């Protein structure tokens, strides 16, 4: 569809094949290669010479006409129902009437008839309507036609009088009025239901001056089909049908005709021609030949050829050259030759045809007659047998056929040249005229038997002895020309096939042999097929069976041979493709040149590999390093931070914090320390991380002076590894911050940290967990697949059984069912006949129908409910499967992430290709990756050759992996002997980037498919094509940039704020005495130099109260013990130990102070301040304490904390109340011994404390117990837990009574060896004290029993509820020395074996320690143990908050015990893993 140029169609430019158009016209999308053509076409389109085909509007531009046609097309889609299209197009096609007449006749046809396919309503009753569709229209009967004619005449044929006529007229008028009212009501309902046009109606319809009545429907009868059911109702009268869709008006019809048809000519009688697509779609009958009807269309598609001279010299020129030219210059068409369909009616009466003995077809008869009629045999080939159209089949038109045949044959005879050498040209022209005028087809059919044989026999002699230059028959020439024109056209395939069949029938063997090669095979094949059909028709049934059997065997043999040849050919091709050669020896296209990776100024391209290492490590292990899903570290940002002078402080230190958080919490870093304190206990912040990195990466810790020289001697002899850094880098870190180093030094430190973390147990556990999760996911997947297969197998088996059962019972059920159905039908018919008589039966039937409807509705509701439930279940299963599939894919991807990253492959030049994660987007090419530490070689084998890296190869980084060369073609067998003959050359390590999909496609096209390296690279690149293109797309996203920050100023500000914060907390918590806090803050804010800050830190440490210090800053304070008179020697030893410990503490403190004074960096000062922070007992602070009596905060100056239980009391809340804070240690009333409480009323606390310190002595047994307590405290400190087991100490101290002055105290000893007391009052005191303690302990033990009862009910505690038997684990008692379980603990609780909460907790720890010792890592018992222990901790915190639960976990030693029982040497642990203490 396109606008007309004037009144002629103007074809659009065809699209360019396979090339991108350079110049395109917007509204038609026509493409041009050159600007000249494009501008010329635009200039022509802008002229006002175009006509809209649909509306007829002229003097428009091409775009205006185009848009008007589009608008008309949209209007027709809305306003013209599709069931009228065929009806109107059949009337229009090849019609010579004017447009207005066509519109009127089409409108009248639509208004008086329903169209086939039209959807309307079928009126069954007064209120019931059924949706139906017209299937068939019955023609009008004769009676109806006469009635219609009579109504149209309007005359009265009745012979009655005027009076009768007037009465009859009155009746007729009344009937007409009622009919008109019904029609109006029906029209109104139709108009209500009909679609309203969005366009404006014509003005004629808007005028309300005169009521217009539409024409009535003709009394046709229709077959209709119900839309809801597959039923057809026949012979429905037109009155029972109601049209629901409004028919189109005349304006819409006019648009439709113009839009889809074009008038072929400018005359009044020029026929209308419908578009070819619609003709094919609706199979519209053609009334004329195509080339006569569509000259414009023909001239646009076929350029005009040179016109032949059609007349003889004697004839006059034609008066109508246009028509002659159009008829003579017709295209090659199957209608011209051999594509003839003659009817038997042409050859005369059917009896004569049947009686003729010749069995030849009518076409052959006619050709034989024409041979006789033509004076020269060569004239036969110019005879044309026309194809009769559909109009020829109509009755009453047989008289025109001979004339048409003669006329067409005559025109074609005149239009063709003679192919033979005629001796008299005058005869050639005159004889066909006279004979064609005298003969008729009837005469030709009568004389075919006598006349057809002579020319063939006579014509055969000159054919065999003809001249060497023999011409092909016209049928062959026509086939050649028709094949050349239409061989590639899809719509001409059937016509071309018919032409080939007819030519194969007519041509002889010699003529077929003289055809061109391409056509010769087609015609010969068609000839053999036709011959085969003839032979098949003449065969008997047995011969056919035998022939088919033989054919099948031959076909099988042929297919078998072809399949064998194809397999051999494919195998040879596969083997040829599988051969591999050295890439550099093969020819081919050069690889594309990629650009270098963009790096910031100051960061060389050679360091990009290390940047990718760090970022890829952080990305792959993000589940371990970044569990809180922080924003990721990207390569672009990291490079900017490395190259920035001051702006990279925050970004780089964040990376260091992420790495050190994992390293310092691992067992490998247990022995990392500084000044006697573990690095894991020092606060890790952005400001201390630089110094902590230096301390972690030292090759050895600072030892004592005696060990220092030995360490220095061994330092140089040890080999340098990837997880270590050169000493000169670390020495720079002593005097400068991390962000102040060069880019290369920063990267070396980051890579060393990554390698160090790869050696930790945390990484190993993370990898094992990921692999275990992946294995479990695979198990679940296989189990699900197995279950589905079992279900399918069971369903299939069940279906087979049901089918077998149905086959057995099917026949009997069918017979019984038919009989029952017949009986039911008979009964129903009888019931209907009987019950239709009276009113009662009508009521019954109505009730029965309502019951049936109700039952049917219930059944439908039940089915709907079942269907909805089934759909909901299917949706739930679908979501579950989708979630399981997502979890499976994520688990597999995470398991792959933690494995070693290898390159995709290498190219001919040994360059490696890398694809990293989304944080390092793009496809990277690494050149010059080989260095001196790589021994690149491969081994020769007898069967196959594989290149293996050296076993001693130690990777420089994650880049150095030679997996691409290992056993490249081992699976291809011994036939493929490919050996690499080149090795990668050493050179500068450079990184290139493929950053566009075009470059990737070019790379894939340049890689050789048979190169030993490039074939594998190409295969992997194609496999991961989508992933690579996504990564390339991510590489184009812009970087957000870094937050600018001055690192030195940041460190200075935070050091000031940290100092002020520690001082404030000390004062508020009552942990230190600092005079002039405001002055101290002002002084700190004004400081700039490190030395001044150091003095402030030392002053801060001095202000802390000694008893609130711990770690290396607090002396080992032994409580003064009651001794007997004969224990002076042990007291001297004790004093010596105390002096040694105090000396050690003093020396450690002095070292710390010296380190502060010598600190050269702010991060070092932050670390030393963090040590002070870690040595302060912040849990003893009164800042957040509440009074135990009134539960209120505030009034810190009147709040006192118990040194035993650490609970707070207001001075005035105590009874008796205190009026000032006592000096020294103070115990609350609950922690004081009862005798001391009773005897201390009215006594000063200071005197009592001094008297307690000066009186009494203690036996050696008590001293051993105290030493055990101290060792236990040391164990807590070694484990890095700054908690005191104060409940245990309190329980043991509270047994010791505070004796009165001048009286020897009682001795605390083992219960079995307890000596009898001397004085009765003392015995009474002890009894009272014991009762008091026993009541409190019994309450606590009752709570312990309740906790145990809840633990037994906990669902994850099932492995620990009962003792382990030897049936469950044979070697359990060989590994576990002290078995323990919840049942045993429960029995001990019921028997009263526990004397304190600590004994109960000791057994609980033993249960968990045994589980941890016996079970392997990753087992379900260990996971249950962790959850049960967490539950125990929560219960203890809720019910027994004063009893801390701490269990030390040691993974390496199988013979470990609980923390409070065994004394393990932490130094041996430190020497067995991680850094070497001594080299």
UniProtKB/Swiss-Prot annotation:
Taxonomic source organism: Mus musculus
Compositional bias segments (type: Acidic residues): 1254-1277
Gene: Baz1b
Compartments, as annotated in UniProt: Nucleus
Domain named DDT: residues: 605-669
Main subcellular localisation: nucleus
Residue stretches of biased makeup (Polar residues): 415-425
GO biological process, one term: chromatin organization
Segments forming domain Bromo: 1335-1439
Biological role stated in the UniProt entry: Atypical tyrosine-protein kinase that plays a central role in chromatin remodeling and acts as a transcription regulator. Involved in DNA damage response by phosphorylating 'Tyr-142' of histone H2AX (H2AXY142ph). H2AXY142ph plays a central role in DNA repair and acts as a mark that distinguishes between apoptotic and repair responses to genotoxic stress.
Name of this chain's protein: Tyrosine-protein kinase BAZ1B
